[in-house]
């Protein structure tokens, strides 16, 4: 999603609150909870879940391994839910031609660097760079080359844009910023 006028362009970044992240966190939570309950029922010797008789799963080694997988899965699920709650990776890219400044803001993990804020002068932007890697794990990324700073990614690598959409976005941004486009 973006907002644009003659002198200002704001590009809003989604972050971790995507449908796929909600689905993965929910599936991982349910699966790991199931593993933990099966491991616990094998330890107690009675059915916590009525799907599996506790006599079929011996605590050592199957019950221990299932309990370990359940606990590990719950930790990973907790991590995913925290990134969704904190909305890690969301923010905006603001390009202001009137002031000649580019502002990039992202939310991070809680702590000293929770708010990630970068500011550049437009005159320091060398180019807009497109990096396209086709194949099994196709990757299309849009970068902004800053003099003395290197390349800053403007689009997340997990967003599935087609090559045409990336090229269109790069062309519009390069035209707005009045800088050349590089393709790698």
UniProtKB/Swiss-Prot annotation:
GO terms for biological process: photosynthesis. The chain crosses the membrane at residues 22-42, 57-77. It is found in: Plastid, Chloroplast thylakoid membrane. One of its GO terms (cellular component) is chloroplast thylakoid membrane. The keyword S-adenosyl-L-methionine does not apply. InterPro entries: PSI_Ycf4_assembly. Pfam families: Ycf4. Keywords: Chloroplast, Membrane, Photosynthesis, Plastid, Thylakoid, Transmembrane, Transmembrane helix. It is a multi-pass membrane protein. HAMAP family: Ycf4. Belongs to the Ycf4 family. Seems to be required for the assembly of the photosystem I complex. This is Photosystem I assembly protein Ycf4. The gene is ycf4.
